[in-house]
Every structure is written in structure tokens, then in C-alpha cells.
Regions:
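Active-site loop of classical SDR/Rossmann-like NAD(P)-dependent oxidoreductases
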Residues: 274-285, 302
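Predominantly a Rossmann-like dinucleotide-binding segment in NAD(P)-dependent oxidoreductases
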Residues: 123-207, 321
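Hydrophobic residues in well-ordered beta-strands that form the structural core
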Residues: 92, 117-119, 227, 253
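Beta-loop-alpha module in the N-terminal Rossmann-like domain of NAD(P)-dependent dehydrogenases
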Residues: 38, 47-109
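Rossmann-fold dehydrogenase core element
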Residues: 105-123, 142-149
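N-terminal Rossmann-like dinucleotide-binding module
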Residues: 1-47
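C-terminal helix-rich "cap/oligomerization" subdomain common to oxidoreductases
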Residues: 1, 27, 58, 66-69, ...
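Contiguous beta-strand/loop segments that form the cofactor/metal-binding neighborhood of enzyme cores
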Residues: 174, 180-257, 281-295
Length: 326
């Protein structure tokens, strides 16, 4: 069965995810809505969709089964509730919601209506992170002791990502990707967080309150994690990595080059995942399969609600300079 997917948003990630959905061979894009009609039409030409609008409400006229939402987090909430109200499955391009309150409501509505809602963290589907998860959970490096992560991204202060109100803040927009969502999937939900942040590079009124953040978290099993994330990334500096320290070895994820280095008591190997199946394609397949009741989605509302809660705790700790218990 070919599923009809409507798209809200016409930016780069809307294109990436729409093409991944089309590549499944089980979906068609039936309508596109963007604040700017010209943007929707340009996108429509690229993927062969004529039904383009400057509001998302008319998308109902295209008889969609589901909607892909790729817009700033603040208006994303209203679009998600609208889609659920009209009985549509939802693939949200980023975090589940802009606040934990909205995320909890989305989880409740989706469960009550029996609808699929998938948050946008595609990395959980990738071969690299599936291998890391097995590595840690099977204790291949002994007992895990600590984690250190770096996530740097050269943010553009003229875009919504840098806008505190539209984005919900850097911990929500950026740190849930690097690497709260993945660490939660592997280690479980953190117990507490202590964080500090600053705003040095771009300091105009209304921009994100934490441009750079250092967060220390305690995960189940007394695993400690240090996470550095920033919208500052000068030049060609590598910006994505995670180090896992175990009692009998260590592993390092190089997110810039999609490799995994493993050291087990001096026995070293490097695994290259550059040619592995695109996680966006795997997520698209899982999303569509879930329409038939299959338990294929890895970023469900009840799970990804916790990403939002952790991001809020990080922001709260940055402001209070106190440990926040979750």
C-alpha cells in the first residue's frame, strides 16, 4: 500500500526526510505547506508534488495518512496537535516538542488515538550506533565507567536555530542530538545533571541563552558523563565525537567520519560505517511499517519525552548553577 504523506516545511531537512520516505517505495508526497508559498512550490517541483500551500490546514484536502513536520520547534507543537486531532500519523523532524508539558500531552493524545508519532533522531537506526549499543550492553569493554562527548555545530544567528523562543534553546535543539537521545537509548535515563553555559560569540537580544554548554550527568549504574556542546565551531575543526571508558577497554565514535575505534585490553580495531545504510532511510521504513501496527519505531513519544526533560534540566542547571535531579 502506498501511503500519502503531507509535508509541513520546505527547508533542507524537509527535503532529506521526504526523499527518504519516497525511497521506501511505499510513500508519496501528497502536499506541501510552507510559510512562503514560493518555497513550497520550489520543493514541489523537485519531488513532483503540485499541491502546495502557505498554510498547513489545506493539506487535509490531499487526503494524507501522515504528516512530516520540519519547522521551528515553537510552531511545531501546534502543527503536531493539529495532525493528531485529524487522525494523522506524525514524523517530527526534531525533538518531540518545545516543552516537556507539550511532549507529555502529545504522548497522551497519540496513545489515546492509536497514532504513530516518531521523533526525528535517526541515528538510533544507524549501524554504527547499533554496534555501540551492543558493545556497551554486552559489556565487551567490561563495566562502563564514564562517557565524554563533544558536539560542535557552526550555528547561523540569522536562523531559527539561534532564536531562543523559536528553537526552545540550544540544549533542546542541539544537545538532544549530541548526544542525549543516543546516550539515553544506550544507558537509560539520567539521574541528575549539573551544567554551566555561556554566550560569547553571538550575544544579541533574543538569541539562545546557552550558546555553549558543559553538562555533567549521572546515568544508571553510576556511569558519569561529561557533555560539551556548542553553536561555535571555528573553521574545519572536527566537532562530533563520543568516548566510552570501560574497566577493560574503551571505544571512540568519530561522528565526523562515521567510524568506531574499539580497544579491548590492547586489542584494537577500527570499524568504518561510511558506506552503511542511511539512517534516515531506515527511519522512514520504520515509520511507515509502524502504520500497520509493527513495533518498529525507536523514538516513541513516551521515550523522547525524556529528551525534552533532560534538556530542560540542563538549561535550568545552567541558570541556577545547582544540580537538578530528574
Amino acid at each position: 500500500m502506498i501511503r500519502r504523506i503531507a509535508v509541513i516545511g520546505a527547508g533542507n531537512m524537509a527535503r532529506v526526510r521526504s526523499k527518504a520516505l519516497l525511497a521506501t517505495g511505499q510513500a508519496t508526497i501528497c502536499g506541501i505547506a510552507s510559510r512562503t508559498l514560493a518555497s513550497a512550490r520550489r520543493f514541489g517541483v523537485e519531488i513532483g508534488c503540485d499541491a502546495c500551500y502557505d498554510r498547513y490546514e489545506p493539506l487535509l484536502d490531499t487526503s494524507p495518512d501522515a504528516v512530516l513536520i520540519e519547522i521551528p520547534h515553537q510552531p511545531q507543537d501546534a502543527a503536531t496537535f493539529w495532525a493528531l486531532e485529524h487522525g494523522l500519523h506524525v514524523l517530527v523532524g526534531g525533538c518531540l516538542a518545545s516543552t516537556s508539558q507539550a511532549a507529555r500531552q502529545i504522548a497522551d493524545v497519540a496513545q489515546a488515538k492509536g497514532l504513530v508519532v516518531e521523533a526525528g533522531y535517526a541515528s538510533r537506526y544507524g549501524a554504527l550506533w547499533r554496534r555501540v549499543r551492543r558493545l556497551i550492553q554486552d559489556c565487551e569493554m567490561g563495566r562502563l565507567v564514564a562517557v565524554r562527548s563533544i558536539a560542535l555545530w557552526a550555528g547561523d544567528p540569522t536562523t531559527w536555530y539561534y532564536d531562543q523562543a523559536l528553537s526552545g534553546g540550544m540544549p533542546l535543539t542541539h544537545m538532544t542530538y549530541g548526544y542525549i537521545n543516543l546516550l539515553r537509548w544506550i544507558l537509560g535515563d539520567p539521574v541528575c545533571v549539573s551544567a554551566m553555559g555561556n554566550r560569547v560569540h553571538h550575544t544579541q537580544v533574543g538569541l539562545v541563552e546557552q550558546e555553549t554548554c558543559l553538562a555533567n550527568l549521572v546515568f544508571p549504574g553510576d556511569v558519569v558523563a561529561n557533555m560539551m556542546a556548542s553553536f561555535v565551531k571555528p573553521g574545519d575543526l572536527d566537532g562530533w565525537s563520543v568516548l566510552f571508558l570501560g574497566t577493560e577497554g574503551m571505544a571512540k565514535v568519530d561522528g565526523d567520519h562515521n567510524t568506531l575505534e574499539i580497544d579491548r585490553q590492547g586489542q584494537q580495531e577500527t570499524l568504518d560505517y561510511a558506506g552503511s545504510v542511511d539512517p534516515f532511510a531506515l527511519q522512514a521504513q520504520a515509520f511507515i511499517a509502524a502504520f500497520e501496527g509493527q513495533d518498529t519505531c525507536l523514538n516513541t513519544p513516551t521515550d523522547c519525552l525524556e529528551d525534552v526533560r533532560v534538556a530542560e534540566a540542563i538549561a535550568r542547571s545552567c541558570k541556577s548553577l545547582e544540580t537538578v535531579w530528574l
